[in-house]
Amino acid sequence: MGKDFYKILGLERKASDDEIKKAYRKLALKYHPDKNKSPQAEERFKEIAEAYEVLSDKKKRDIFDNYGEDGLKGGQPGPDGGGQPGAYTYQFHGDPRATFAQFFGSSDPFGAFFTGGDNMFSGGQGGNTNEIFWNIGGDDMFAFNAQAPSRKRQQDPPIEHDLFVSLEEVDKGCIKKMKISRMATGSNGPYKEEKVLRITVKPGWKAGTKITFPQEGDSAPNKTPADIVFIIRDKPHSLFKREGIDLKYTAQISLKQALCGALVSVPTLQGSRIQVNPNHEIIKPTTTRRINGLGLPVPKEPSRRGDLIVSFDIKFPDTLAPSLQNQLSELLPN
């Protein structure tokens, strides 16, 4: 059963935006690890941040209300429909201090609010086509900024989003078009605008690779917009597992195939199949076969590739007839 973000913040499901902000402010200050030294404070602080991020964002909150945490993180369609599973997937960035700094306009509001200190958090950090929509900001994201003193133009912490790519996309490279919605400031005041950010995913890019778009976050008076950072993540694959530039595949074979040294047909990421074990050697549970050059491209040298590493899952029979057991006992060495 997934988390109940309303319960974490001590709210009813009909809570208003203002009540959500007040609950987060109270609990975040209470459980901030710099102030609260209890062993549970760190985990409680993280739960509170995640609950606020979901409930303060209308899109995330609508999905959570309809599908719960599992639906929110498992890729349910957005509240506007669209019919495509996986059209929106949320993953908490895992940094409750960044949420705290965004909300209060400071990584240390205790000093700013109570001692007059100036300790503001300063951010700053660089095929197939897909379009994904993210709402970058939110009307209440920086509700308490005006209360924190500042002597220079501050920048909000980077806004990070995971960008999931398939192994096929990593193999060939691809282009991702990410449509964002953000607040901008004009002569007539703030307004919402949409913009498409184009990301060229290079062949062989590793999970964890960061693509930074400087100052593409929400705009506000006397503040430098946050950088938007996309982080490459590997989509799970039905056949292969990635290990650096190598690919791992587990072939299912029978005990007969293993003992008789059968040829084993193995798929490749490119769609073809190859025959493994050409010398008809006995295949043991620990046996592996390495096929050179059938892995992923080396990021800085795409003409070079890693290897395809094949391991074997040998299926043993559940039962054997007594007569067959006797034959095997005679035939097989001790």
UniProtKB/Swiss-Prot annotation:
Domain J, residue spans: 4-68
SMART domains: DnaJ
Induction note: By heat shock.
Keywords assigned: Chaperone, Cytoplasm, Phosphoprotein, Stress response
A Pfam family that the UniProt record links to this protein: DnaJ
Protein name: DnaJ protein homolog 1
Keyword Ribonucleoprotein tagged: no
Modification type Phosphoserine: residues: S187
